[in-house]
From Swiss-Prot:
One of its GO terms (biological process) is cell redox homeostasis. Coiled coil: none annotated. Pfam families: Thioredoxin. Residues 2-106 form the Thioredoxin domain. The keyword Transport applies. This is Thioredoxin. GO terms for molecular function: protein-disulfide reductase activity. It comes from Helicobacter pylori (strain ATCC 700392 / 26695) (Campylobacter pylori). Belongs to the thioredoxin family.
Length: 106
């Protein structure tokens, strides 16, 4: 089973600059984030080689969170070739996340 990519200020830009990525902004104390975590793990496995499934710990990456204006968590950013193209806030279904990823992978 594939694992998501943990993003930091150091690897964020280089990781998302090419292709499609889903970036989950989360925190360890966040109940809804914990509910979403297994879905993120499943997507990382299902989309291996097609899209990057990533997570940003907002407690550890405050500057990165501020850069993207993250005010509520979980916040999910969908990127294509380094540009944010869609954003969802709150717990989402796996179906909704797959739908958005598949649209971007087109």
């Amino acid at each position: 089973m594939s694992h998501y990519i943990e993003l930091t200020e150091e690897n964020f830009e280089s990781t998302i600059k090419k292709g499609v990525a889903l970036v989950d902004f989360w925190a360890p104390w966040c109940g809804p984030c914990k509910m979403l975590s297994p879905v993120i793990d499943e997507l990382a496995s299902e989309y291996e080689g097609k899209a990057k499934i990533c997570k940003v710990n907002t407690d550890e990456q405050e500057e990165l969170s501020a850069k993207f204006g993250i005010r509520s968590i979980p916040t999910l950013l969908f990127t294509k070739d380094g540009e944010v193209v869609h954003q969802l806030v709150g717990v989402q279904t796996k179906v909704a996340l797959k739908e958005q990823l598949n649209k971007l992978l087109g």
